[in-house]
UniProtKB/Swiss-Prot annotation:
The protein's name: V-type proton ATPase subunit B 1
Subunit structure: V-ATPase is a heteromultimeric enzyme made up of two complexes: the ATP-hydrolytic V1 complex and the proton translocation V0 complex. The V1 complex consists of three catalytic AB heterodimers that form a heterohexamer, three peripheral stalks each consisting of EG heterodimers, one central rotor including subunits D and F, and the regulatory subunits C and H. The proton translocation complex V0 consists of the proton transport subunit a, a ring of proteolipid subunits c9c'', rotary subunit d, subunits e and f, and the accessory subunits vah-19/Ac45 and vah-20/PRR.
Gene name, Swiss-Prot/TrEMBL: vha-12
Disruption phenotype: RNAi-mediated knockdown causes hyperfusion of embryonic epidermal cells. RNAi-mediated knockdown suppresses hypoxia-induced cell death, and, in a mec-4 (u231) mutant background, neurodegeneration of touch-receptor neurons.
GO cellular component: proton-transporting V-type ATPase, V1 domain
Transmembrane segments: none
């Protein structure tokens, strides 16, 4: 009988850690002929491969990594993730690995903090990798996708009643600099969970959060880290931080590494993953920088013409897959430059994603939190996630009626500024009263106030009772009979 090596599993684990990102070098070159921004151009390269990873050793011995972006005969253009400062054309050594960019993934990543390239920065050991996955992900067969139908209760009335989020949806927060989008995202992460129906047992879900920050300042990174630690969810969070002083080019791979980790947690570990990406505007600007360095023909406002396709490769990595228990729900945050919703970044994002949550500066200036303007906000998958058996049978009607009354109230408010309050009819005054109370009682709530969807609907009914019953034209008579009388919504 052959002797069994008891150290074999340990040796295997050791090699897994040591291997980490390293791939055996294929060919070594010292033929750098030019450096342009984040790009390095090499001459006399034999058989370079598109998207191949290149290990770069600088004259001082420090190592960087890059990716082949372009190939022309025997020339290769390499994008360096850590930046090109200090690269010397004569003494820089480039190793072509013959492999694409892979990231080590494991369930042990939860509770850890990584930099934008996926390397640990929390003074902990390297991740004991269960697998090395391509950061561009596996394409999901559209036929295998499951339509998102379970509503995520965020505890925020303006989202739960008016723009319900389904598990597996991708819905961005459209914000601007100086607005509390980070606080809203943290509140959604803190309070998010399935709707608990009264007649069903309480469900404990297998929940995880993947948070990727691109180009954020230290204060934002500290805010999220502290918030996760304070509410006790840090052991279920995987943080990827590319700060404002980190290399710009690293921002291009940060969301992809984060989503690769999320896909592993969702489809292999059967977890329901919430992915928060902030700030997508920094990502798009990094894309523009690379495009300008490659001297490509620019599109609108200098952004590359392929930005729509590139953003889709990130946003489309959300959803549910048949035969797998996990799901990925995406909440990207983007800051609109100059509060302009027609800017290419929010414009293209809105085309790809399934709605948007619009954070409004005027509401914020009036000290309303969360300053979510429900009129330009939208959730395209709301209709399939609400109603009898999922939330409550009156949900859709209440939402429509609140929208209608709020929109009319806004028109009346604009008219009042022109003609004065004396010229308004009694109906107009009712809409004005509704407008004030809607913003004060329905939209406004505390940072730690967690309202169930049923509480939010009841507040909606309290506001609708401002109007006589015959003015509520968007709610069927049978629903009015059940919920319009005082106390009806509570029963």
């Amino acid at each position: 009988m052959a002797a069994v090596d008891v150290n074999q599993p340990i040796t295997g684990h050791k090699s897994a850690i040591i291997r980490n990102y390293n791939t055996n070098p294929r060919l070594i070159y010292q033929t750098v002929c030019g450096v342009n921004g984040p790009l390095v151009i090499l001459n006399d390269v034999k058989f370079p491969q598109f998207s191949e990873i290149v290990k770069i050793t600088l004259p001082d011995g420090s190592k960087r990594s890059g990716q082949v972006l372009e190939i022309s005969k025997n020339k290769a253009v390499v994008q360096v993730f850590e930046g090109t400062s200090g690269i010397d054309a004569k003494n820089t050594i480039c190793e072509f690995t013959g492999d694409i960019l892979r990231t080590p993934v494991s369930e042990d990543m939860l509770g850890r903090i990584f930099n934008g390239s996926g390397k640990p920065i929390d003074k902990g050991p390297p991740v004991l990798a269960e697998d090395f996955l391509d950061i561009n992900g596996q394409p999901i067969n559209p036929w295998s996708r499951i339509y998102p139908e379970e509503m995520i209760q965020t505890g925020i009335s303006a989202i739960d009643v008016m723009n319900s989020i389904a598990r597996g949806q991708k819905i961005p927060i459209f914000s601007a600099s100086g607005l509390p989008h980070n606080e809203i995202a943290a509140q959604i992460v803190r309070q998010g969970g399935l709707v608990q129906l009264p007649d069903r047992p309480h469900e404990q879900t297998n929940f995880a959060i993947v948070f990727a920050a691109m180009g954020v300042n230290m204060e934002t990174a500290r805010f999220f880290k502290q918030d996760f630690e304070e509410n006790g969810s840090m052991e279920n969070v995987c943080l990827f931080l590319n700060l404002a002083n980190d290399p710009t080019i690293e921002r291009i791979i940060t969301p992809r590494i984060a989503l690769t980790s999320a896909e592993f947690l969702a489809y292999q570990c059967k977890k329901h993953v919430l992915v928060v990406l902030t700030d997508m505007s920094s990502y798009a600007e990094a894309l523009r920088e690379v495009s300008a360095a490659r001297e490509e023909v620019p599109g609108r406002r200098g952004f590359p013409g392929y930005m729509y396709t590139d953003l889709a490769t990130i946003y489309e990595r959300a959803g549910r897959v048949e035969g797998r228990d996990g799901s990925i729900t995406q909440i990207p945050i983007l800051t609109m430059p100059n509060d302009d919703i027609t800017h290419p970044i929010p414009d293209l994002t809105g085309y790809i994603t399934e709605g948007q949550i619009y954070v409004d500066r005027q509401l914020h200036n009036r000290l309303i939190y969360p300053p979510i303007n429900v009129l330009p906000s939208l959730s395209r998958l709301m209709k399939s996630a609400i109603g009898e058996g999922m939330t409550r049978e009156d949900h859709s009607d209440v939402s429509n009626q609140l929208y209608a009354c709020y929109a009319i109230g806004k028109d009346v408010q604009a008219m009042k500024a022109v003609v004065g309050e004396e010229a308004l009819s009694s109906d107009d005054l009712l809409y004005l009263e509704f407008l004030t109370k809607f913003e004060k009682n329905f939209i406004t709530q505390g940072h730690y106030e967690n309202r169930s969807v049923f509480e939010s609907l009841d507040i909606g009914w309290q506001l609708l009772r401002i109007f006589p019953r015959e003015m509520l034209k968007r709610i069927p008579e049978s629903t009015l009979e059940k919920y319009y009388p005082r106390g009806g919504a509570k029963e």
